[in-house]
């Protein structure tokens, strides 16, 4: 299966890229991450340099799932450029220049808490977009274990926008930070997503109170 998925990435090197093959390739990128296909790391790192935003976004996410330490420098390069650049949007779109959420989440998932990585992530905790701030805090909480990065996430769980509340809930679950349990339980979010977040806590903790919380929903 994995060799076939890797082969499905080849059309992304064509110019122009066939739209149907592009869609297949994007699904292959996602699948390689889910399967934690370490032998796909090199190809996924190359795809981080493509002009296609969605390809960079999904490649970053999958490299995080694979925990590809060799990709750290490539991911950090996507975060570089200073405050002006990271706030810029693409012409005719609401999307930013880079898929910062998936890049930040990938660095947190890879788990290398080097000084250079921390320095690169930290400015994004002040980004104008709440979900990017959340992704940065999520990554820093994963990398450092410092609860000061959990505080902004807890606060964002009270945001007026339900989409932001949902995203932040999943971020808290992904960190495995057990003190977030009461906030997850109390959040104004549907129980189906609370279960996903609680499952994230349960996967990283042996505390049975998480299982009790899941049963109570």
Name these PLM-found stretches.
Residues 1-15, 37-49, 68-90, 113-125, ...:
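Amphipathic alpha-helical scaffolding segments comprising HEAT/armadillo-like alpha-solenoid repeats
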Residues 2, 21, 25, 56, ...:
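Residue-level detector of extended alpha-helical repeat arrays and alpha-solenoid scaffolds
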Residues 10, 33, 64, 108, ...:
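Structural signature of alpha-helical solenoid repeat scaffolds
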Residues 17, 21, 51-52, 82-84, ...:
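Short inter-helical turns and helix N-cap capping residues of alpha-solenoid HEAT/ARM repeat scaffolds
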Residues 22-29, 60, 100-107, 134-137:
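Boundary/linker elements of alpha-helical solenoid repeat scaffolds
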Residues 82, 91-98, 199-205:
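Extended, low-complexity, acidic/polar intrinsically disordered regions
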Residues 119, 130, 134-138:
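Alpha-helical adaptor scaffolds
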């Amino acid at each position: 299966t994995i060799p076939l998925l890797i082969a499905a990435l080849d059309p992304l090197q064509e110019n122009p890229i066939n739209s149907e093959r592009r869609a297949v390739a994007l699904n292959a990128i996602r699948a390689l991450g889910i399967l934690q296909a370490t032998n796909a790391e090199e190809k996924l790192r190359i795809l981080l340099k493509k002009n296609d935003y969605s390809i960079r976004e999904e490649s970053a996410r999958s490299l995080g799932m694979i925990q590809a330490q060799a990709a750290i420098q490539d991911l950090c390069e996507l975060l570089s450029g200073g405050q002006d650049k990271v706030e810029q949007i693409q012409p005719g779109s609401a999307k930013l220049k880079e898929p910062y959420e998936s890049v930040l989440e990938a660095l947190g998932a890879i788990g290398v808490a080097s000084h250079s990585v921390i320095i690169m992530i930290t400015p994004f905790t002040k980004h104008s977009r709440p979900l990017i701030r959340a992704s940065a805090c999520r990554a820093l909480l994963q990398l450092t274990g410092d609860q000061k990065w959990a505080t902004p996430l807890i606060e964002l769980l009270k945001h007026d926008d339900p989409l932001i509340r949902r995203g932040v809930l999943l971020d808290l679950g992904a960190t495995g930070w057990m003190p977030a349990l009461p906030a997850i339980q109390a959040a104004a979010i549907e129980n189906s997503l609370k279960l996903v977040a609680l499952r994230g806590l349960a996967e990283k903790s042996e505390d049975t109170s998480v299982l009790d919380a899941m049963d109570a929903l």
